Amino acid sequence: MKRIGLFLLTNIAVLAVAMITMNLLGVGSYMQGTSLDLGNLFAFAAIIGFAGSFVSLAMSKWLAKMSVGAKVIKEPRNADEQWLVETVRRQAEKAGIGMPEVAIYEGAEPNAFATGMTKNSALVAVSTGLLRHMRQNEVEAVLGHEVAHIANGDMVTMALLQGVVNTFVIFFAKIVAYVVDRVVLKNESEGHSITFIVVDIVAQILFGILASMITMWFSRKREFHADNGGAYLAGKENMIAALQRLQTMQPGELPDQMAAFGISARPSNIGDLFRSHPPLEKRIEALRATTQDQLKVA
């Protein structure tokens, strides 16, 4: 129920921002009588596409805390929390970013994630399962991986890519709906018919599935960079050890908006093209093939 509420709130915010922005920019209707104004349509698609992506990014820390129940460590209550905060602080300084918020959330399975709108206003969260089942040097490497995601600007880059993808999904879906409605079925009434709306929804779903291959491909590439950064911040052998440990465990499930920035993910049921993370063995191989002077963060 909580996730449904968060989803509805996000969409209400997206629509509000989109409508206000379109009014400010003077973007009119993309339907001119029975014809399609491609310029206005593209502007409409871009505003909606980027608004959705960046509103989600802006709300990502709040959504993360709400969806997994992450508790930010404001004042460390024990030695473990003190170590977590100090480790992230040291890694953030080495990576040249502002100190992220550090949080812990209840989860039997091992995982961690990073989120936030900017490099200097981010969140790093770890599950209790990760702390329970991993050695300290392995946890340090996982934290380094997440700090590297922040330092590399992966959240903003992913939001930009998602905005571009959203734009083209909306744009081409409405063109397909227009062609089916006006050209194939020869509907000449003004405005959107039921056919247009149904075809538009179906086309957006289909194009969205195809477009997700692009975002997942990008996510897999960024994982190698985050592993590299984690090795730079916490040590190459520690990063390899953490990934090897994950090979023996079932990774925890994360909400969709954070899955791309977790340390690991469950395999996709529909093939590698839809995986947000490369197979762990490939990540380990890539690290082993990397020399010490190739380790870095952005």
Curated annotation (Swiss-Prot):
Binds 1 zinc ion per subunit. Zn(2+) binds at H145, H149, E223. Its cofactor is Zn(2+). It is found in: Cell inner membrane. CDD domains: M48B_HtpX_like. Disulfide bonds: none annotated. The chain crosses the membrane at residues 4-24, 38-58, 160-180, 194-214. The keyword S-adenosyl-L-methionine does not apply. InterPro entries: HtpX_protease, Pept_M48_protease_HtpX, Peptidase_M48. One of its GO terms (cellular component) is plasma membrane. The keyword Magnesium does not apply. Its main location: membrane. The active site is at E146. GO terms for biological process: proteolysis. Belongs to the peptidase M48B family. This is Protease HtpX. The lineage of its organism: Bacteria, Pseudomonadati, Pseudomonadota, Gammaproteobacteria, Thiotrichales.
